[in-house]
């Protein structure tokens, strides 16, 4: 009699979980574009649809640091964003990668149970997170809202979370391009960047009305100010609002990431089954893609959240103050760290602040580079892309490294892959730091995530066969 596995506990829930059926035939590229566009439209509508029953508040957002990375929008149906999906996915990938759960992803039955377990855990996280948000007073004191509104708020968040899970599954199963997670993150970040560049919203800063969008502000200042030189300077360097230098910095980061995406080490391989058949196995500079910055951002965001919650309740406690002291930014209700451990984990506000506090800048750079390098090296072990995994994949395909026997192939890959992962992770961290210091729109982390995801989508589209000519033209 075989022992009961963890995944077997999921079987009773399979009939009750909604599921997107696997397509019976290959979906044409144009239909994939249509489904991807429809998914995106639903996400955008949900991002703007306010929750019914909330008490509006201009107080500091304790989840501010997580919003962009988690495709979340405060006070809307997309309040939870992709948090339940990404948290569930990372937990199960960690459990499978460290063999804490018994699963063979080569078997269809195990693969389906594994995906169902991920979905079930994401639903549980949605219910738990929604309940915590409502009962901790994020939308107003529960006693003021009443039992009916409290239940309605939780229901709205859980149903919206379920829709997001199904939209992600729709794309993952081949009806669309890529995954819902990547699509929603990139859309959220690009929407933020475009808004900061072209927003027509007028803000009174004490010097008269100014437009929030950097490009709109440039034309407005040139048309309304007599001194054109001063108008240009103001448009390029104005404080507390997006400026042209921020926009140019964003474009520089976009170009740098796309350029570095092309860096790779080509490992020559040959077939052990067909004489004369040769090829190459590419090891990219960004071997783990954007995972290091996502994991680092998730770590920092959660540390910031805990510190902010502790400081709001125990602001006089010495240990809490050593952890982090929070004060409101000038002209906003949003809190930012001004001292303590979390201050050194957060980026300088701008290049001037970086020069004025070199210790903060040095510690932040060291933290970013180290965290991204460590996360990148760790991720290859749990994601099925370690030297041992790659050696097994090559062996299964009947390939060996040119000049190496099967037995020595693992040693050579062990010399190359961890180094590439750590160096690539550090490069991602360095780009994020540079992006933050230059003041790129949408934060350094957000800009990097957007570029790597968009580049990934471009590659997916190219693989579909419709954009091969375009790719060749752009890549030269």
Swiss-Prot record:
GO molecular function: peptide transmembrane transporter activity; protein transmembrane transporter activity; protein-transporting ATPase activity; ribosome binding; signal sequence binding
Transmembrane segments: 34-54, 77-97, 120-140, 147-167, 247-267, 362-382, 416-434, 441-458
Free-text function comment from the UniProt entry: Appears to play a crucial role in the insertion of secretory and membrane polypeptides into the ER. It is required for assembly of membrane and secretory proteins and is essential for cell growth. It interacts with other membrane proteins required for protein translocation. Upon binding to SEC62/63 complex, secretory precursor polypeptides may engage SEC61 to begin membrane penetration event. A cycle of assembly and disassembly of SEC62/63 from SEC61 may govern the activity of the translocase.
Cytoplasmic domain ranges by topology: 1-33, 98-119, 168-246, 383-415, 459-476
Record's keyword annotation contains Endoplasmic reticulum: yes
One BP term from GO: post-translational protein targeting to membrane, translocation
Subunit structure of this chain's protein: Heterotrimeric complex composed of SEC61-alpha, SEC61-beta and SEC61-gamma.
Annotated keywords: Endoplasmic reticulum, Membrane, Protein transport, Translocation, Transmembrane, Transmembrane helix, Transport
GO cellular component, one term: Sec61 translocon complex
Keyword S-adenosyl-L-methionine: no
Family: Belongs to the SecY/SEC61-alpha family.
InterPro entries: SecY/SEC61-alpha (IPR002208), SecY_CS (IPR030659), SecY_dom_sf (IPR023201), Translocon_Sec61/SecY_plug_dom (IPR019561)
Subcellular location per the Swiss-Prot or TrEMBL entry: Endoplasmic reticulum membrane
Major site of localization recorded for this protein: endoplasmic reticulum
Lumenal side: 55-76, 141-146, 268-361, 435-440
Protein name according to UniProt: Protein transport protein SEC61 subunit alpha
Membrane topology label: Multi-pass membrane protein
């Amino acid at each position: 009699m075989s022992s009961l596995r963890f995944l077997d506990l999921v079987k009773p829930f399979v009939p009750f979980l909604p599921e997107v059926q696997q397509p019976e035939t290959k979906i044409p590229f144009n239909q994939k574009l249509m489904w991807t566009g429809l998914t995106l439209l639903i996400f955008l509508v949900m991002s703007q649809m306010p929750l019914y029953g909330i008490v509006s508040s201009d107080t500091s957002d304790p989840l501010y640091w997580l919003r962009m990375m988690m495709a979340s929008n405060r006070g809307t149906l997309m309040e939870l964003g992709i948090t339940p999906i990404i948290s569930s996915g990372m937990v199960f990938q960690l459990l499978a990668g460290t063999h804490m759960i018994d699963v063979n992803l080569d078997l269809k039955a195990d693969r389906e149970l594994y995906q169902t377990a991920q979905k079930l855990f994401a639903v549980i996280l949605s219910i738990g997170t929604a309940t915590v948000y409502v009962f901790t007073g994020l939308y107003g004191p529960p006693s003021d809202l009443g039992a009916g509104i409290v239940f309605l708020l939780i229901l709205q968040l859980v149903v919206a979370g379920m829709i997001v899970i199904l939209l992600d599954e729709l794309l993952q199963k081949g009806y669309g391009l890529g995954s819902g997670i990547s699509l929603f993150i990139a859309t959220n970040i690009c929407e933020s960047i475009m808004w900061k560049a072209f927003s027509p919203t007028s803000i009174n800063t004490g010097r008269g009305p100014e437009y929030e969008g950097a490009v709109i502000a440039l034309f407005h200042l040139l048309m309304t100010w007599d001194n054109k030189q001063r108008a240009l300077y103001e448009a390029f360097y104005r404080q507390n609002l997006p400026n042209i230098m921020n926009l140019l910095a964003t474009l520089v980061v976009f170009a740098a990431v796309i350029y570095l995406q092309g860096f790779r080490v080509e490992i020559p391989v040959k077939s052990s089954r067909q004489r004369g058949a040769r090829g190459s196995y590419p090891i990219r500079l960004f071997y783990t893609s954007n995972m290091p910055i996502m994991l680092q951002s998730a770590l920092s965001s959660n540390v910031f959240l805990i510190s902010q919650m502790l400081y709001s309740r125990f602001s006089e406690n010495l240990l809490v103050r050593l952890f982090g002291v929070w004060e409101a930014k000038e002209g906003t209700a949003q809190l930012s760290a001004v001292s303590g451990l979390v201050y050194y984990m957060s980026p300088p506000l701008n290049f001037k602040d970086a020069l004025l506090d070199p210790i903060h800048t040095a510690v932040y750079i060291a933290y970013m580079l180290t965290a991204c390098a460590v996360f990148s090296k760790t991720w290859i072990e749990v994601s099925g892309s370690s030297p041992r995994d790659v050696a097994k994949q090559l062996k299964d395909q009947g390939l060996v490294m040119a000049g190496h026997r099967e037995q020595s192939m693992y040693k050579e890959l062990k010399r190359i892959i961890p180094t590439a992962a750590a160096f690539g992770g550090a490069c991602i961290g360095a780009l994020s730091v540079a992006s933050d210091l230059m003041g790129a729109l949408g934060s350094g982390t957000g800009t990097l995530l957007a570029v790597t995801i968009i580049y990934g989508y471009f590659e997916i589209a190219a693989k579909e066969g419709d954009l091969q000519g375009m790719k060749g033209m752009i890549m030269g």
